[in-house]
């Protein structure tokens, strides 16, 4: 938990399965949280989808979040790499620590360094009192970058597509957090699972989606399951212009993310 109510609350968005809607979730959650306070979105996925959606398509001449986790002699401060989204209409409330494929090289560079699992946590420490919320995107696989995203966070949410693969990814993500806890790392509280790409045929949910959500509940008893995010081309369109679903007037599609924001705010108060 945050050490002080004045420090940023850090939320990691993690799933060990591709196509889960992680970057979509980060875009929506960070944008919604920016209405509540100053928010920093950290793209910690070398694919850099979040970075591109927020308007930064070429970082060849720019420093990125990769430089903030390098060994001491080459390391930059997070505040040295922060950018405003190109399509910024949020009056500076939402900022971005961008990423590109150089983040993979940075991960390779630190693989033998002691304490490497917490380099992102170390990098964030000097800026925790500059923000109300920090939201971290992560790669869709086990590895040093995902460990860093998890261990830098106070809270964690797991988006996962409504497929068998998605169920496996969600369960594997929960197992990973428990494994890190067993190794005596301080791990974040898991707020719950967001079922994404929930497919419907007209007014009826497809059998596959229904079975996946049932499997999530059975595989992870006691884990909170948020409302699902329906499969929609609207999600893709809003992503590519850097808007949240709420900003686009799609409140029904945004329901799950509004629930996560509410859960995070309550957890921040009650711990």
Annotate each predicted stretch with a short phrase:
Residues 1-271:
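P-loop NTP-binding core
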């Amino acid at each position: 938990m945050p050490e002080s109510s004045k420090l940023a609350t850090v939320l990691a968005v993690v799933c060990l399965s591709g196509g889960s809607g992680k970057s979509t979730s980060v875009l929506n959650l960070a944008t919604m949280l920016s209405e509540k306070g100053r928010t920093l979105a950290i793209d910690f996925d070398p694919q850099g989808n979040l970075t591109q959606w927020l308007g930064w398509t070429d970082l060849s001449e720019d420093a990125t979040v990769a430089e903030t986790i390098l060994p001491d002699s080459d390391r930059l401060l997070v505040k040295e790499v922060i950018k405003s989204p190109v399509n910024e209409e949020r009056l500076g409330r939402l900022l971005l620590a961008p990423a590109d494929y150089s983040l993979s090289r940075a991960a390779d560079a630190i693989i033998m360094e002691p304490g490497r699992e917490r380099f992102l946590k170390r990098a964030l420490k000097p800026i925790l009192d500059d923000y109300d919320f920090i939201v971290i995107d992560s790669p869709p696989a086990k590895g040093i970058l995902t460990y860093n995203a998890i261990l830098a966070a106070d809270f964690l949410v797991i988006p996962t597509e409504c497929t068998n693969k998605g169920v496996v990814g969600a369960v594997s993500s929960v197992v990973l957090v428990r494994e890190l806890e067993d190794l005596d790392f301080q791990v974040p509280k898991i707020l719950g699972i967001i079922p994404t790409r929930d497919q419907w045929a007209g007014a009826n949910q497809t059998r596959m989606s229904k079975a996946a959500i049932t499997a999530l509940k059975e595989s992870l008893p006691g884990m909170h399951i948020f409302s699902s995010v329906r499969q929609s081309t609207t999600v893709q369109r809003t992503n590519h212009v850097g808007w949240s679903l709420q900003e686009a007037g799609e409140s029904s599609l945004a329901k799950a993310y509004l629930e996560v924001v509410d859960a995070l705010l309550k957890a921040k108060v009650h711990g």
